[in-house]
Amino acid sequence: VVKGINRHSFSVDGGRATSAAMSRQDALLIKEMNMNAVRSHYAPDEHFLDMCDSLGIVYMDELAGWQNCYDEKVGSKLVKEMVQRDVNHPSIIIWSNGNEGGWNYQLDKLFAQYDKLQKRHVVHPWADFNDLDTHHYPAYLTGVARFTNGYKVFMPTEFMHAMYDQGGGAGLRDFWDRWNTNPLFAGGFIWVFCDEAPKRSDKGGILDSDK
């Protein structure tokens, strides 16, 4: 079962700038939290994939795109670059074509074209696609009804929004225990690994969601 976390490349000191040291720190923390899978909204730094390979963390490698998809001309180039770069990382178990409507169906076939040996599964996060139900943020009752009465493997690629302490994580046990009784449950990816705000020096040492 996938015990996953969504992760953005972010640190309080460097913002969106990354480093191998940051990748190591994040991967070790994810492992310590008993998580075994990671998803991002774009292809990660290779040094993060290296850490996933070495620690036995599986990864969902995603073509960037949210709500609005790439056209075929641009998207085909990006799929080629991403898959050819990452295809030999054993941590990658799934390719993701965009996020929450940001998928171009014409690009789906290209993943297998560059992943000729394994032809790993392609998903559309937030959709019921390719025999995998990945719908996001179900309420408890609707989630139980949808998933436990369904007929496809289900694995929400985002659920339990807990960023900036919005409280989503508080109900994780209730969701997880209920879903885990269903043999079609493949796990899921909670949102999100950490709050995303840079360290600031203009608040007199006060810590809040903006610091």
Give each language-model segment a name.
Residues 1-32, 50:
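N-terminal carbohydrate-binding accessory modules
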